[in-house]
Amino acid sequence: MEAFRTHTGIGVPLRRSNVDTDQIIPAVYLKRVTRTGFEDGLFAAWRNDPSFVLNLPPFDRGSVLVAGPDFGTGSSREHAVWALMDYGFRVVISSRFADIFRGNAGKAGLLAAEVNQNDVELLWKLIEQNPGLEITVNLQDRNIIAGTVMVPFTIDDYTAWRLLEGLDDIGLTLRKQSEIEDYERRRPSWKPRTLPV
């Protein structure tokens, strides 16, 4: 997983609340056996509407999504995070995330930055008044800069550390590779073994 320190990209105002994982990517798009290629399913029902924000330049090139409260509710669908990332989003900003979505995002490398709702409203206003406005998100300092405005965000320390280090679940395991190999060498021969790679 790529480490996340700062990201600068076009802000996209998604003025919707209670966006669940089925709205992010409908189940019909989940039939792949790979972890990539889900961008076509992102907000598929809404993208049929020509006035939907992702159909409008410059928002169609955005990478910082500013969404309403309760983003990512519904089922535990990792594909929702993958679809956002495959489309090009690196950050989702909201005043409230579903716990499972927040966890899936952090494990995949997508920053779920939680701010208060007044700051979401302020960011929406700035983005809509200045289409193409670039937003910088700094994970180390835990702030968002849009024009002359700086907004703090919250994220738990463990998820922030994983993102800063670029550690997904496999990366975390590989940090202990020598200890795992040592354990395997010391196991009794009659117990099952993992095969060397």
UniProtKB/Swiss-Prot annotation:
This is 3-isopropylmalate dehydratase small subunit. Gene3D superfamilies: Aconitase, domain 4 (3.20.19.10). GO terms for biological process: L-leucine biosynthetic process. PANTHER family: 3-ISOPROPYLMALATE DEHYDRATASE SMALL SUBUNIT (PTHR43345:SF5), 3-ISOPROPYLMALATE DEHYDRATASE SMALL SUBUNIT 2-RELATED-RELATED (PTHR43345). One of its GO terms (molecular function) is 3-isopropylmalate dehydratase activity. The lineage of its organism: Bacteria, Bacillati, Actinomycetota, Actinomycetes, Mycobacteriales. It comes from the Bacteria. It comes from Mycobacterium sp. (strain KMS). Catalyzes the isomerization between 2-isopropylmalate and 3-isopropylmalate, via the formation of 2-isopropylmaleate. GO terms for cellular component: 3-isopropylmalate dehydratase complex.
